[in-house]
């Protein structure tokens, strides 16, 4: 069995291979653009992209979308989260929005949409809980890694090298996908 993972992120491919390939599920990587719709949930975005990629490539595809959801800012739309992603500094973005706020609880939700050609996508989710730091720190990773502190840690993920940082992420979505694929193997 094989799936085509649509992403330009080598770390995502590595995680998928570590979980799926020992079970006999080959993971191929294709970097291609898909339409990233504006939606209220990461599930909707992943579903749309997986289906679009499957129709274009005529094969089973895997596509994911990730969002950082901050309890204190839950009234703000996902569009604002996306805008903050690239303005992640002490002067703008999430840190600015959280200035003076006590509740800094946050979670990453990652939706994996698996789409067999000609069928409707199935979605599997991973949730990594944590808090938002008061200031950026670290030299590893990208984007949110510099401000997101996973539960059980005291400093942002950006302070940890790749292997340690990757181990902090919840991979339940990929594990559930693996179970689904094995159960429905033809």
Task: Tell me what each language-model feature is.
Residues 2-4, 11-186:
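Anionic-ligand binding patches
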């Amino acid at each position: 069995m094989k799936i085509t993972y649509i992403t330009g992120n080598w770390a995502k491919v590595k995680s998928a291979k570590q979980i799926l390939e020992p079970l006999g599920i080959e993971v191929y990587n294709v970097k291609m653009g898909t339409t990233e719709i504006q939606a209220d949930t990461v599930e909707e975005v992943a579903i749309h992209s997986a289906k679009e990629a499957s129709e274009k490539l005529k094969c089973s595809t895997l596509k994911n979308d990730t969002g950082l959801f901050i309890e204190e800012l839950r009234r703000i739309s996902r569009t604002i989260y996306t805008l903050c992603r690239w303005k992640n500094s002490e002067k703008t973005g999430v840190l600015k929005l959280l200035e003076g706020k006590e509740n800094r609880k946050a979670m990453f939700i990652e939706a994996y949409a698996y789409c067999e050609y000609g069928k409707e996508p199935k979605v599997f989710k991973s949730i990594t809980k944590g808090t938002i730091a008061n200031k950026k720190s670290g030299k590893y990773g990208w984007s949110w890694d510099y401000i997101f502190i996973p539960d059980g840690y005291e400093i942002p993920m950006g302070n940890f090298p790749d292997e340690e940082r990757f181990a902090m992420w919840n991979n339940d979505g990929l594990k559930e996908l693996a179970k689904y694929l094995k159960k429905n193997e033809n």
